[in-house]
Amino acid sequence: MSSHIQIFDTTLRDGEQTPGVNFTFDERLRIALQLEKWGVDVIEAGFPASSTGSFKSVQAIAQTLTTTAVCGLARCKKSDIDAVYEATKDAAKPVVHVFIATSPIHLEHKLKMSQEDVLASIKEHVTYAKQLFDVVQFSPEDATRTELPFLVKCVQTAVDAGATVINIPDTVGYSYHDEYAHIFKTLTESVTSSNEIIYSAHCHDDLGMAVSNSLAAIEGGARRIEGTVNGIGERAGNAALEEVALALYVRNDHYGAQTALNLEETKKTSDLISRYAGIRVPRNKAIVGQNAFSHESGIHQDGVLKHRETYEIMTPQLVGVSTTELPLGKLSGKHAFSEKLKALGYGIDKEAQIDLFKQFKAIADKKKSVSDRDIHAIIQGSEHEHQALYKLETLQLQYVSSGLQSAVVVVKDKEGHIYQDSSIGTGSIVAIYNAVDRIFQKETELIDYRINSVTEGTDAQAEVHVNLLIEGKTVNGFGIDHDILQASCKAYVEAHAKFAAENVEKVGN
């Protein structure tokens, strides 16, 4: 019988530390709901003491989820622990995650503390946290660069103070397979407690070994894995949870352990995070990449046609990738469109389907067939526009002279107010973005601009991601349209709208 490996998702906390990623309040809530649907055991929803925005989003997630534990991060500070308590007290399963650095380099250069000071702080703050929470998780930050005897002392101190979950972070992705497994074996053999202690692994991918080390931790005695969807996170990112889960599923013969994830929700979860983070999943990414179940070699294709297991160790359906696609066309009616939405797993009410059907027909008039990916794109674009405080109403472009373009942009807010401005620039994109900047009355720096095609072919929809720096804050925007310039404008407007929403501003004169 397989043992249960808990999944601790930190996409909303560690994942959001990815450069350029800044989820909105609504996006955080939607992500949390999808993670619960995916079946994760614990969601680290944020760091409540870090900002009012983080506190409010953690609080909203705690009040919304019904089965998944909601965790908040706290330094060894009573005010941090209090903030987590206030944010998560309405959760079905509240958890606090207390941490302090323990490695020599952190003690000397960051904390300016002795080992004795650190041990005293662990005892004081874990004891305090235990008075407020049934479940306290403790992490010795930079554990893999901490002397093992001192690490054992830190963990024993935390356990004696009431921690029942011990997380061992490979904070800078420094460890390797055997070394990391040895740390867990040493702790499980050395630390004593009358309570059951769950050991957890938290690996970063600086040397490309986050998933491998996470699996090594299980071999060493870990019963919980921490990570993010698609492996997003600071620097090179975190362990990709979908890869860990599928490795355990496919190689259950070796690990004898399984997660409780609903694996069929994996692709949908990955796509959601990719869209909101503005980070496209690489085509060759394991499990969820576009090429994960593709076979180009003639020998491979022949083998798969004869028997799929010749070159596939898991099925696309296992992770929610459909392979029995029946495209729609311009003659497809409302009923066929509605049935397609159901088949793709969308529970959309009839009123919302009316607008989606109009968008579908507009695309169907321009394409021979509308694929499942087109349908997903329509819904994604609609969700973004529905959530936005402002959205693009119209865009007009005109060639002026000597390479100059003129752009007139009209934006509408949720109350129906119209904002319009125009500008000239060296090229269409510059003209459009100058006009939008004038509407929102903000100086911006365009950090990143990317165009992806939703499907193959010259008639594909365009998916545009932008990353802007506005008043020192990084925001991303996303736009989908059959016209690249329309998609580019939608993405830029959305980025401005996100900034305005986070700062509760109105635009225009």
Swiss-Prot record:
UniProt cross-references to InterPro entries, sorted A to Z: 2-IPM_HCS-like, 2-isopropylmalate_synth_dimer, Aldolase_TIM, LeuA/HCS_post-cat, LeuA_allosteric_dom_sf, LeuA_bact_synth, PYR_CT
UniProt KW Metal-binding keyword: yes
Domain of life, source organism: Bacteria
Key words of the record: Amino-acid biosynthesis, Branched-chain amino acid biosynthesis, Cytoplasm, Leucine biosynthesis, Manganese, Metal-binding, Transferase
PROSITE patterns (alphabetical): PYR_CT
Cofactor field: Mn(2+)
Subunit structure, as described in the record: Homodimer.
Similarity comment text for this entry: Belongs to the alpha-IPM synthase/homocitrate synthase family. LeuA type 1 subfamily.
Protein name: 2-isopropylmalate synthase
